[in-house]
């Protein structure tokens, strides 16, 4: 939509800016047809069939649909070790093919869920394989975590914990999403009575588009995935971000709000706008990044960022001064004058890991459902490792939430302990 490409891949836009960097996400095929550089993989054919039958079915390259026949049955071990491992080579072939057609490959964007078997098990397998082959490229994931109240399957805590274990090691940036938080935004802010998955996806799209807008359109203050990582990750393991988007308004109340930089700033820092089930008011921001789109002055953006930090200084750790990065892209999304996308690295994300960890422990103590995983060749040790890795992550977040600028000196010598001793 933003680039003026219709569902058959033909360009129908009205501005050269749409085409200027269209190659970031599209390959140009014969007859001026634009093909997205996307690979779709699953362990069962059903989802692919529905994509093919959907409105954008003709857009994707048929070779880039890679699927198995069996399905992972919500089993992480099947996705990561047995079924997924059989399919992964054919996926990697397609990845190589796509990577070779890039002039300057910056990184990979992966969208997957952490609750099921394929997205979590095979998704993390793909991430680790890509990591082996392209160690210096940015690995950005959009990971849909199990929601606190809504649960599709009973083994979600297992799959999610095993996945987080992998994401801590192999991903560079993880944008944490959560269906329930997305539902709440649709329900409360957008006033939709019965939100569909389409509505939820629309919110995620707005964010994905915001994160990558600077790669695709010219701007005054550019940013890319690598700059994002450099500015948002103070310690390599703490790369789980919450994302938000502004302006989100219901259809009826649009004309009551002004689209100004202060208004956008206020809305994107609003806790109700976060797309994952963690409340930033319960923690502190280590860093944050605001990506504005539209015609606005960079001076105004900088003033607002300073303003936020001065007024809410207790919500930002004091040992990282000016920890909000901002970028400005000139072209707003379709149908809006200006918009903003927010990415925050907040210690409050530990709430989510804590919650999953508690659910994990409750089941793992009784070895519930474990035979499904051991039957695929997994070892109980892996579960224990994943559990302790997640607990370490939580205590690291807690440690940096409590750390003050004065205490830094005492901690320097035992930094290597991964925050285990004084959590």
Swiss-Prot record:
This protein's GO cellular component annotations are: cytoplasm; microtubule
Where does the record place Acidic residues bias?
A: 404-423
**Cofactor names:** Mg(2+)
The protein's name in its UniProt record: Tubulin beta-2 chain
Quaternary organization:
Dimer of alpha and beta chains. A typical microtubule is a hollow water-filled tube with an outer diameter of 25 nm and an inner diameter of 15 nM. Alpha-beta heterodimers associate head-to-tail to form protofilaments running lengthwise along the microtubule wall with the beta-tubulin subunit facing the microtubule plus end conferring a structural polarity. Microtubules usually have 13 protofilaments but different protofilament numbers can be found in some organisms and specialized cells.
In the record, what terms sit under GO molecular function?
GTP binding; GTPase activity; metal ion binding; structural constituent of cytoskeleton
* Locations listed in the record: Cytoplasm, Cytoskeleton
Which residues are Mg(2+)-binding? Answer: 44
Source domain of life:
Eukaryota
* Keywords for this protein: Cytoplasm, Cytoskeleton, GTP-binding, Magnesium, Metal-binding, Microtubule, Nucleotide-binding
Residues annotated to bind GTP = 44, 113, 117-119, 179, 201
Give me the ranges of the annotated region Disordered: 394-423
Gene from which this protein is expressed: TUBB2
What is known about what this protein does?
A: Tubulin is the major constituent of microtubules, a cylinder consisting of laterally associated linear protofilaments composed of alpha- and beta-tubulin heterodimers. Microtubules grow by the addition of GTP-tubulin dimers to the microtubule end, where a stabilizing cap forms. Below the cap, tubulin dimers are in GDP-bound state, owing to GTPase activity of alpha-tubulin.
Q: Which InterPro entries match?
A: Beta_tubulin, Tub_FtsZ_C, Tubulin, Tubulin/FtsZ-like_C, Tubulin/FtsZ_2-layer-sand-dom, Tubulin/FtsZ_GTPase_sf, Tubulin_C, Tubulin_CS
Which organism's genome codes for this protein?
A: Oomycete-like sp. (strain MacKay2000)
- Member of which family? Belongs to the tubulin family.
Pfam families per record: Tubulin (PF00091), Tubulin_C (PF03953)
Name the Gene Ontology biological process terms.
microtubule-based process
